[in-house]
UniProtKB/Swiss-Prot annotation:
Species this protein is from: Geobacillus kaustophilus (strain HTA426)
Family membership: Belongs to the sugar phosphate cyclases superfamily. Dehydroquinate synthase family.
Residues the entry annotates as binding Zn(2+): 186, 249, 266
Official protein name in the record: 3-dehydroquinate synthase
Requisite cofactors: Co(2+); Zn(2+); NAD(+)
Lineage, highest ranks first: Bacteria, Bacillati, Bacillota, Bacilli, Bacillales
C-alpha cells in the first residue's frame, strides 16, 4: 500500500492508496482519537451503495462504531441545496455531534456534498474521503467542497480539509468505462499543467482505456495525487498556482451548466475545455501545438473533441464570465505555455467569442 502525507498551510493528513486500503479504517479512526462508540455517518450514492456500503458498514460495526448511512442519487444533480439540506437533516436525526465523523464513500459528487455537509454541520466536523472513482483522485485531495447553483458549478462551498483519504483501488474494478474515461481526463490535465515526463509516459503507455489497469492505473493515480498534493502544498486557498488545476474547467464548467448536469460527464466537459484552452493558447501566444495532435489523442479514448451543436457561444461566454477565477466580469483562463507549464491570463470578451465561434466550427483540430 502506498502512503502519502498531504500537507497544506493549515493541516497535514494521511493518504492511503492500494488494493484493500479500506481495511485500515478502524485503526485509522483510533489514531484520530475516535474510540469505539463514536458515531460515523457514511454518505454514498445509489450506485456505490449496493456494491460497497454493506462491506464498509460491517467493517466499522465490527470495530464497535455506531454506524449510520445516507444514500443520495448518483450524478451531478445531487450536488444541490435540496440534497445538502436533506443530508444535514439526516445527520441531525442520527444525533451526530462534534466528535462524529462523516465518511464520503463515492466519487467526486459524494465527496463534494459530504465534505460541504461536514464543513457546515455544527460549524464544522471531521470527515474522511473514500474515493471509489478515478475522477475522485483529484477532488478527494485538497479540501475543496461545494454544491452547485443553477447559475454555476461549485458556487456554494468551503475549504475544509479531510482527516484522511483512504483510496481502496479494488473499488475501481466495477467502474463503468465512461466513468473511467471521465477520471482519466483529470489525469491528462495533471500531466499537461505540471509534468512533461508524465505526459510523455501517458502518450507511450496508455494507448486505449483498456491500458488503465493494474500497475499502470495505480501509477496514474499516484502521479495525479502527487501533482495535486504539490500544488495544494504551495497554495491551499487558490490565491495563486492552485488556479492552474482549473485548466480546461472554465469552458468545462460552462458546458456542464449550460447543457444540464449529467449531459456530459465532468471529464468529458473538461476534455473539451482543455482542447479549447489549447486552441486559445495557440492564438494568444502565437505558437502551435499541432505536432502533439491533442484532439486525435483525446478522440482515441472516446472523448468529445468539439462543442455540442446545440450550444450557443454567447451563452457559453456568459457562463464563463461567472467562473470563480473571473475578476469584475473579465474571464481569466488557464492557458498552456508549453506541455507541463501553464499560466492564468485575462481575456477580452470579443476575442473569446471569436475563438468560441471558430472552435465551434473547427473543433479541437483548429
Amino acid at each position: 500500500m502506498i502512503e502519502r502525507t498531504i500537507e497544506t498551510a493549515t493541516k497535514r493528513y494521511p493518504l492511503l492508496l492500494g488494493d484493500g486500503a479500506a481495511r485500515v479504517l478502524p485503526s485509522l479512526l483510533r489514531s484520530l482519537s475516535c474510540p469505539p462508540g463514536t458515531k460515523l455517518f457514511i454518505v454514498t450514492d445509489d450506485t456505490v451503495a449496493p456494491l460497497y456500503l454493506d462491506e464498509v458498514r460491517a467493517l466499522l460495526a465490527a470495530a464497535e462504531y455506531d454506524v449510520y448511512a445516507y444514500v443520495i442519487p448518483s450524478g451531478e444533480a445531487a450536488k444541490s441545496f435540496d440534497h445538502y439540506y436533506a443530508c444535514q437533516t439526516a445527520a441531525l436525526q442520527c444525533g451526530l455531534d462534534r466528535r462524529s465523523v462523516i465518511i464520503a464513500l463515492g466519487g467526486g459528487v459524494v465527496g463534494d456534498l459530504a465534505g460541504f455537509v461536514a464543513a457546515t454541520y455544527m460549524r464544522g466536523i471531521r470527515y474522511i474521503q473514500m474515493p471509489t472513482t478515478l475522477l475522485a483522485h483529484d477532488s478527494a485531495v485538497g479540501g475543496k467542497v461545494a454544491i452547485n447553483h443553477p447559475l454555476g458549478k461549485n458556487m456554494i462551498g468551503a475549504f475544509h480539509q479531510p482527516e484522511a483519504v483512504v483510496y481502496d483501488t479494488s473499488f475501481l474494478r466495477t467502474l463503468p468505462e465512461r466513468e473511467l474515461r471521465s477520471g482519466f481526463a483529470e489525469v491528462i490535465k495533471h500531466a499537461l499543467i505540471r509534468d512533461r515526463r508524465f505526459y510523455d509516459w501517458l502518450r507511450a503507455e496508455i494507448k486505449t482505456l483498456a491500458d488503465l489497469r493494474g500497475e499502470k492505473l495505480a501509477y496514474c493515480i499516484e502521479k495525479g495525487i502527487d501533482i495535486k498534493a504539490s500544488v495544494v502544498r504551495e497554495d491551499e486557498k487558490e490565491t495563486g498556482v492552485r488556479a492552474h488545476l482549473n485548466f480546461g474547467h472554465t469552458l468545462g464548467h460552462a458546458l456542464e451548466s449550460e447543457l444540464g448536469y449529467g449531459a456530459l460527464t465532468h471529464g468529458e466537459a473538461v476534455a473539451v475545455g482543455m482542447l479549447f484552452a489549447v486552441f486559445v493558447s495557440e492564438r494568444f501566444y502565437g505558437r502551435s501545438f499541432a505536432e502533439h495532435r491533442l484532439a486525435d489523442w483525446f478522440a482515441g479514448y472516446g472523448f468529445p473533441v468539439s462543442l455540442p451543436t446545440t450550444v450557443q457561444t454567447p451563452r457559453l461566454l456568459e457562463k464563463m464570465k461567472g467562473d470563480k477565477k473571473a475578476y469584475a466580469g473579465t474571464v481569466r483562463m488557464v492557458l498552456l505555455c508549453e506541455i507541463g507549464d501553464v499560466e492564468v491570463v485575462e481575456l477580452e470578451d470579443d476575442n473569446l467569442l471569436t475563438w468560441l465561434d471558430e472552435f465551434a466550427r473547427q473543433g479541437g483540430k483548429g
